[in-house]
């Protein structure tokens, strides 16, 4: 088994009415927690790397860690660049062995988005990789992605068919109300995704895989844990899991999850160090953090995404 593209994963997911989890990775423990969960659930998985994670962990280390996870689990694992902002970055990741890249030109005018996406598609396809593109702009902050609420915009369903046909992209991220980071909705408001947009997009692109970014649910037990042990995250709210389940039953084949993993790791480490103030062995607190990431991912795979047993 080697690193695979998402093409077969998405075809099966679309036909089966479930979604694949795309989890952001930064280090060994996060990769291990995710892939151990996927192995126990016999689930396909996408490990995705932001440009910030690539800088932090070193591009060679990350690729080799993912290759090790493939060997260790025997699972189909897709290695994906999240939010590539240039042709040069996408090309570098394809050259490094990524099987999938995202070119995010969603903030550019439509014609510029088409042109840049097409350029990335031509290079990636020539080298055996697939491409995710984006129409519509999500608000929020996550790594190098910083978009103010007033600069965000829903995807226009009337644009999607032309965009996909002209670019040749393999999947499309759309904006239907999710956002990046841990503060997705204002306290006191009812979170609600625009399923009407999703349904119209899927009607215009039958059988085509749709992607949801910014889909962490922000588990309140970890928010409370962080706040209890020295942190400050008032008003952190995520996407309700029942709405993600609904999206997975429709045309959404890839659901991106990052903040939930960060919360699980940070909350666990804060709690452990507060309860063991004399401890200084990183294995003692990184081990429990890895285990809680594993349990969180198992929950997502089984109870939200529905991709258990689909590897």
Show which residues each predicted segment covers.
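Conserved residues at beta->alpha junctions
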Residues: 24-25, 214
């Amino acid at each position: 088994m080697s690193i695979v593209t998402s093409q077969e994963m998405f075809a099966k997911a679309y036909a089966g009415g479930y979604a694949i989890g795309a989890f952001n990775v930064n280090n060994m423990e996060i990769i291990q927690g995710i892939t151990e969960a996927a192995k126990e659930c016999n689930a396909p998985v996408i490990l995705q790397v932001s440009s910030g994670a690539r800088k932090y962990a070193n591009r060679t280390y990350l690729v080799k860690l993912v290759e090790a996870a493939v060997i260790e689990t025997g699972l189909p694992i897709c290695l994906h660049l999240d939010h590539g902002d240039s042709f040069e970055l996408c090309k570098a990741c394809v050259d490094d062995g990524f099987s999938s890249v995202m070119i995010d030109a969603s903030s550019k005018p439509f014609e510029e988005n088409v042109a840049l996406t097409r350029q990335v598609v031509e290079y990636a396809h020539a080298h055996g990789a697939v491409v995710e593109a984006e129409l519509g702009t999500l608000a929020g902050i996550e790594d190098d992605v910083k978009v103010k609420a007033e600069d965000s915009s829903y995807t226009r369903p009337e644009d999607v068919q032309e965009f996909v046909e002209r670019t040749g992209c393999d999947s499309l991220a759309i904006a239907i109300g999710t956002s990046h980071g841990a503060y997705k909705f204002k306290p006191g408001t009812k979170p609600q995704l625009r399923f009407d947009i999703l349904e119209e997009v899927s009607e215009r692109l039958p059988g085509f895989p749709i992607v949801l970014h910014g889909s962490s649910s922000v588990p309140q037990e970890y928010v409370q844990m962080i706040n209890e042990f020295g942190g400050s995250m008032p008003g952190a709210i995520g996407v309700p899991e029942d709405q993600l389940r609904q999206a997975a039953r429709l045309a959404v084949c890839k659901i991106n999850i990052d903040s939930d993993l960060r919360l699980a790791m940070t909350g666990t480490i804060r709690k452990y160090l507060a309860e063991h103030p004399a401890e200084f062995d990183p294995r003692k607190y990184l081990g429990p953090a890895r285990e809680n990431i594993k349990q969180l991912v198992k929950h997502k795979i089984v109870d939200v995404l529905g991709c258990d047993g689909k590897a």
